[in-house]
Amino acid sequence: MAAKIIDGKTIAQQVRSEVAQKVQARIAAGLRAPGLAVVLVGSNPASQIYVASKRKACEEVGFVSRSYDLPETTSEAELLELIDTLNADNTIDGILVQLPLPAGIDNVKVLERIHPDKDVDGFHPYNVGRLCQRAPRLRPCTPRGIVTLLERYNIDTFGLNAVVIGASNIVGRPMSMELLLAGCTTTVTHRFTKNLRHHVENADLLIVAVGKPGFIPGDWIKEGAIVIDVGINRLENGKVVGDVVFEDAAKRASYITPVPGGVGPMTVATLIENTLQACVEYHDPQGE
């Protein structure tokens, strides 16, 4: 069996085009364009690349994009003060603080300071709690983007045995809740899991998010499984690969996401969707 490739790049472009059309319709109706504030503290090169892609996506769909590039020496108090200002700004629908933050700044305190209705990353405990209680509002971008991919490929997830490898706050944990909502029987594995291979071999739907190149061998994959590879790992030779050995896994899976061009583009597309949702549902006058 040769797996069908889940083309995240194409689906992400579709999502962005849909958002752009809705923004044009808003402006034609006399409503304002959604606004996203992107805050970067310090000069982490990887963060700069991520932030640039988010700002570019904003401008492409017609959002107002506001950039705040703060020096590495910024204090926690100064960052919290900026968030307070953005929370009170009626032209800003989403606030994104790029992680990781420099040493000395408490990530949790910063994320909790963002108003839940402007938390377009979906990391605020309120939004995570809403997802947990089956009443989601703004949802974490990567897990939601993965669900969108499955939906757009008409993959029926109800009753599937889903296995998530990696239990991070950004992907693994919220992913498990999205999969429960999607009707899966969900197992979350992590660094202390015994006999990982056994779990992988029984997975109808496998989501791998550990950040280790080639962590899952292709011969572990169940015949006909759906494989979603969240890993983005740059090798010494410059090649970008996922957490799954793609060539071998693709021989056994029914569907598989490539790296790059699979999950990555969906994260930014979902951020854009979340910002429009925040604008329409929580900040428009009729949304009150």
Curated annotation (Swiss-Prot):
NADP(+) binds at G166, A167, S168, I232. One of its GO terms (molecular function) is methenyltetrahydrofolate cyclohydrolase activity. It catalyses: (6R)-5,10-methylene-5,6,7,8-tetrahydrofolate + NADP(+) = (6R)-5,10-methenyltetrahydrofolate + NADPH; (6R)-5,10-methenyltetrahydrofolate + H2O = (6R)-10-formyltetrahydrofolate + H(+). Keywords: Amino-acid biosynthesis, Histidine biosynthesis, Hydrolase, Methionine biosynthesis, Multifunctional enzyme, NADP, One-carbon metabolism, Oxidoreductase, Purine biosynthesis. InterPro entries: Aminoacid_DH-like_N_sf, NAD(P)-bd_dom_sf, THF_DH/CycHdrlase, THF_DH/CycHdrlase_cat_dom, THF_DH/CycHdrlase_CS, THF_DH/CycHdrlase_NAD-bd_dom. Gene3D superfamilies: Leucine Dehydrogenase, chain A, domain 1, NAD(P)-binding Rossmann-like Domain. Pfam families: THF_DHG_CYH, THF_DHG_CYH_C. One of its GO terms (biological process) is L-histidine biosynthetic process. GO terms for cellular component: cytosol. Its EC number is 1.5.1.5, 3.5.4.9. Pathway: One-carbon metabolism; tetrahydrofolate interconversion. PROSITE patterns: THF_DHG_CYH_1 (PS00766), THF_DHG_CYH_2 (PS00767). Catalyzes the oxidation of 5,10-methylenetetrahydrofolate to 5,10-methenyltetrahydrofolate and then the hydrolysis of 5,10-methenyltetrahydrofolate to 10-formyltetrahydrofolate. Homodimer. Belongs to the tetrahydrofolate dehydrogenase/cyclohydrolase family. This is Bifunctional protein FolD. The lineage of its organism: Bacteria, Pseudomonadati, Pseudomonadota, Gammaproteobacteria, Enterobacterales.
